[in-house]
C-alpha cells in the first residue's frame, strides 16, 4: 500500500497515478516472469526432471522487529535444485513499506549479511527487503523472498 502525501491525495486520479509512478516505481519483473514461463513450457515437454531448469530455493525469516539503530543479522539458506551457480542480491522494495528513506544491507551479494535499522525510522514503520536469487541455468530462474522489518519502540 502506497501512502500518499496529503498534498497529493486531493489531486485527480491520473495525477495521483503519475506521482506514484515517479516516486514509487515498481520493480521490473518482466524478464524473470518470461523466463519462468519458458521454463514451465519446457517442463511440460521434458520427461526427466534433471533435463529442465528449476528456480532457486530460499529459506529464512519472513518478518523481524528491531529498534532504530539496531543491527539485525540476516541469515538465509539459498540453494538451487539443479546445482546451478547462484547470484544473490538484496534490495529495498520502497513502495511496499512505510519507511521512505533509502536503506542498504552490509553485503547485498550475500545471503548471510546484516542490516541496521535507520536511526530516523519511526516506531511502526515497515521496511521491506527483497532477497533475490538468480541461477545461471537456461533459462535463468529467479526466486524472491520478502523480509518485512517492523520498527519497534
Describe the residue ranges of each PLM region.
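A post-motif C-terminal structural segment
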Residues: 1-48
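Low-complexity "stalk/linker" and mucin-like segments enriched in Ser/Thr/Pro/Ala/Gly
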Residues: 58-60, 92-120
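Short, solvent-exposed loop/linker segments at the N-terminal edge
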Residues: 64-72
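Extracellular acidic, Ser/Thr/Pro-rich low-complexity tracts
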Residues: 77-82, 94-95, 135
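Extracellular and select intracellular beta-sandwich modules with Ser/Thr-enriched
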Residues: 140-147
Amino acid at each position: 500500500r502506497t501512502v500518499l502525501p496529503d498534498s497529493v491525495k486531493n489531486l485527480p486520479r491520473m495525477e495521483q497515478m503519475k506521482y506514484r509512478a515517479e516516486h514509487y516505481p515498481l520493480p521490473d519483473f518482466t524478464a524473470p516472469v518470461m523466463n519462468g514461463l519458458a521454463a514451465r513450457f519446457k517442463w511440460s515437454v521434458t520427461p526427466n526432471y534433471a533435463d529442465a531448469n528449476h528456480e532457486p530455493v530460499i529459506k529464512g525469516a519472513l518478518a523481524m522487529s528491531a529498534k532504530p539503530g539496531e543491527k539485525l543479522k540476516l541469515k538465509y539458506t539459498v540453494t538451487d535444485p539443479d546445482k546451478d551457480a547462484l547470484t544473490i542480491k538484496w534490495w529495498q522494495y520502497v513502495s511496499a513499506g512505510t519507511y521512505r528513506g533509502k536503506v542498504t544491507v552490509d553485503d547485498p551479494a550475500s545471503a548471510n549479511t546484516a542490516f541496521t535499522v535507520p536511526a530516523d525510522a519511526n516506531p511502526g514503520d515497515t521496511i521491506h527487503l527483497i532477497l533475490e536469487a538468480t541461477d545461471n541455468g537456461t533459462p535463468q530462474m529467479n526466486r524472491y523472498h520478502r523480509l518485512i522489518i517492523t520498527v519497534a519502540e
